[in-house]
Design a protein with these regions (language model features):
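Conserved N-terminal phosphate-binding loop of PLP-dependent enzymes in the Aspartate aminotransferase
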Residues: 1-203
Length: 203
């Protein structure tokens, strides 16, 4: 969790909250009602400005869920032919270590000897609007990018890249999904890194 930790280490106020909560209930499923889930979701949606939120256990699980949501939208709303949906990703990405996610990694150590790999992903140069536009076709469901890449250093795209990608997605009826596990929650001076570009992703 080296890149996902957003709350520091052993802050006294957080330790107390964690301890107090564990005395009440340590873990439960969304399948069961608790009196804290509603207020939690209300807080998250108010902070983020999105209408909905889905709590997950990890960044990789969140990305996997975003992939599933994008594919379902592509088949049900965009009417892409079944099992043909594609998602555009960037070279040098890091979204997690599940079997699906490593399938679109460009890092050999992350994917070698773990095949066969999951199809349905097209990788383009990070920061290139032209590459994104050229990769889009009738089967493109979504783009999935990090606003700032964190696997090989702190790699920022050109200033105009996210606004360009937003425009390209709007023009082609493609979802824009941003993974902010490493760049979100105030790490860049704003709640989400995409806010510096004055755009809003779909998820």
């Amino acid at each position: 969790a080296y890149s996902a930790v957003s709350h520091g280490h052993a802050h006294p106020e957080l330790v107390k909250v964690f301890h107090d909560q564990s005395d009440t209930l340590a873990l439960t499923s969304r399948a069961f009602y608790t009196n804290t889930l509603g207020p939690y979701l209300e807080t998250i949606t108010r902070m983020s400005g999105f209408e909905m939120a889905l709590p997950m256990n990890s960044g990789a699980e969140a990305v996997e869920t975003a992939i599933k949501a994008a594919r379902r939208w592509a088949y049900r709303s965009k009417k892409i032919e079944p099992n043909k949906a594609e998602i555009i990703v960037a070279n040098g990405n890091f979204h997690g270590r599940t079997t699906t996610i490593i399938s679109f990694s460009s890092e050999p150590n992350s994917k070698d000897d773990f095949g066969p790999h999951t199809p349905g992903f097209v990788s383009v140069e990070f920061g290139s609007s032209q590459a994104v536009e050229e990769a889009i076709n009738k089967n493109t469901a979504a783009v999935l990018f990090e606003p700032i890449q964190g696997e090989g250093g702190i790699i920022e795209p050109p200033d105009n890249w996210l606004p360009d990608v937003r425009e390209i997605c709007d023009k082609n009826n493609v979802l824009m999904i941003l993974d902010e596990v490493q760049s979100g929650l105030g790490r860049t001076g704003k709640l989400f890194a995409y806010e510096h570009s004055n755009i809003r992703p779909d998820g």
